[in-house]
Amino acid sequence: SDRLTQGLKSLFDTMRDGGLYGPDDIPWFNGGLFKTVAVPKLEILDITELRNAANLNWSAIDVSIFGTLFERGLDPSKRSQLGAHYTDPATIERIIDPVIRRPLLQKWELLAQKIKGLEAKIVRKGDKHYRAAHQLFITWLDELKNFRVLDPACGSGNFLFLALKALKDVEFLSHTQAATMGLDRETDLVTGPHNVLGIELNEYAAELARVTVWIGELQWRIEHGYDFKTNPVLEPLDHIECRDALISLVPVEADSGSLSSDSGARAGQRPGPHEPAVPKS
């Protein structure tokens, strides 16, 4: 038991920094997953369960199960307090499709028409029409790279992963269609975990959200023919934060000329849902 505990700690330390573990060259994982390595003492039953789990193939795990794990692991009396409820992918898609996927696809379709118009004028690769078409595509990729999705109560990260998947699907389609229009295919994608931001009050859920995004990103890349990234394998996900999304109220002073007497807003009080916060002068 003690030898296994020490062996696992040594493995996790190596995964954090990269290097040799016995005869094996372990990649540099980073990402904060092994920032603090504390392996608990393992009993015989723990070791048996660990061995059984290690014999399974986890490469195609459905990351949405982490939501169920999180909800079932909570004290039932605290679920409503935390607003913790597993939302199935079909329900999440009802938000993602009209808010993220469809608007981006519509923008891409308009841009693709412009690229096709320039393509018809291309005499040779590298001429001014080709360069103009390529620049349109690069500008589009920059837009996707800088696109951000925020879930201020992200739970175990199902929404974040499905939002990232939608972004990556749009980019993959863009690359495929751009290649059919004669543009050189880019070597890698610009979308990734940096596109999704999350806030979660529960520390366990916030960590699950990071794992969900990490695993989902790796699975998507492999399924679409891309190698997983190296140095590091995992991007740091500090933008999935463990804190309360409701920030503390900062007292404000109302300017008597900017608020009507019946607006309901008072200095030092939280404004209502339709009332502006008045900054201190």
Q: Which residues are covered by each model-predicted region?
A:
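Class I S-adenosyl-L-methionine-dependent methyltransferase module
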Residues: 143-150, 156-281
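Preference for the N-terminal adenyl/adenosyl cofactor-binding alpha/beta module
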Residues: 1-166, 195, 199-205, 243-251
